[in-house]
């Protein structure tokens, strides 16, 4: 009986010793205390916002489109146009799609006989008008181009023309200034025999500057006039055949643009 108890007792003591040793080696780390949530007072006035959300105090200047008006001469004329002495059968938006075609006949502005002058109100202050013109004049004084207009006695027209006589270069570029019904020289005539040209007429105060370009990017000054007229209307025109020949030469305007100079 004692032998049996010894065999039973020793293993039991051995197991107990192992368990006690393991207990000595196990370190029970207390769990971390739950985080304490502290609600701090708002410090909007005392604490600056991060720099990337700081509001700016600089005023924002709105972008101003330098183009006041542009007509591509597509299916119908843009708003604001009026015809002076219109002959409907002599102008078209269909014969050259995307362009205004005017059959330039006889008559002149100062004689109040030129037909189909297309005009719209001029902006206040400084401005410039521009068009791409295709024109091949071959009769004396035939003219097509831009016009800044007060009335039949006070206006400036600038474009391509054919002119014989004193101060003329036959086919070329011309700028005509009429003041109080009289032509004001010079006309800044320059030989130009290409059919296509970009015309630009600029108003700056009392100065009127005529520029041309072959590509619409680089412009060359033709000349300038001083005028105290009040520019009321702007637009395009074609005509001025004074030879009495019934032949008309079409002038084709690809677009008309009014913008800040």
Where in this protein do the model-derived segments appear?
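N-terminal hydrophobic targeting signals that begin at the initiator methionine
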Residues: 1-2, 24
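Extracellular glycan-recognition regions
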Residues: 25-28, 37-261
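C-terminal motif of bacterial Sec signal peptides marking the signal peptidase cleavage site
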Residues: 19-22
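Hydrophobic alpha-helical membrane-embedded or membrane-associated segments
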Residues: 13-17
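Bacterial N-terminal signal peptides that target proteins for export
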Residues: 2-12
């Amino acid at each position: 009986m004692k032998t049996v108890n010894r065999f039973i007792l020793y293993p039991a003591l051995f197991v107990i010793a192992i368990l006690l040793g393991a207990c000595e080696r196990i370190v029970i780390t207390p769990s971390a205390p739950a985080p304490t949530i502290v609600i701090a007072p708002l410090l909007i006035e005392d604490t600056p916002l991060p720099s990337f959300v700081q509001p700016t105090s600089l005023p924002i200047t709105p972008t101003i489109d330098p183009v006041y008006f542009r007509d591509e001469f597509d299916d119908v004329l843009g708003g604001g146009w009026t015809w002076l002495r219109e002959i409907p059968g002599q102008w078209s938006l269909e014969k050259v799609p995307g362009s205004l075609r005017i059959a330039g006949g006889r008559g002149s502005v100062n004689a109040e006989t030129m037909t189909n002058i297309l005009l719209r109100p001029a902006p206040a202050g400084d401005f410039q008008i521009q068009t791409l013109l295709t024109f091949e004049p071959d009769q004396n004084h035939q003219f097509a181009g831009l016009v800044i207009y007060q009335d039949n006695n006070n206006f400036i027209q600038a474009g391509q023309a054919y002119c014989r006589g004193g101060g003329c270069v036959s086919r070329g570029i011309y700028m005509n200034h009429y003041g109080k019904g009289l032509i004001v020289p010079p006309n800044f005539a320059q030989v130009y025999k290409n059919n296509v040209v970009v015309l630009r007429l600029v108003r700056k105060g009392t100065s009127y500057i005529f520029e041309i370009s072959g590509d619409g990017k680089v412009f060359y000054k033709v000349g300038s006039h001083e005028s105290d007229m009040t520019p009321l209307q702007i637009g395009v025109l074609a005509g001025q055949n004074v030879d009495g020949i019934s032949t008309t030469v079409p002038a084709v305007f690809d677009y008309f643009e009014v913008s800040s100079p």
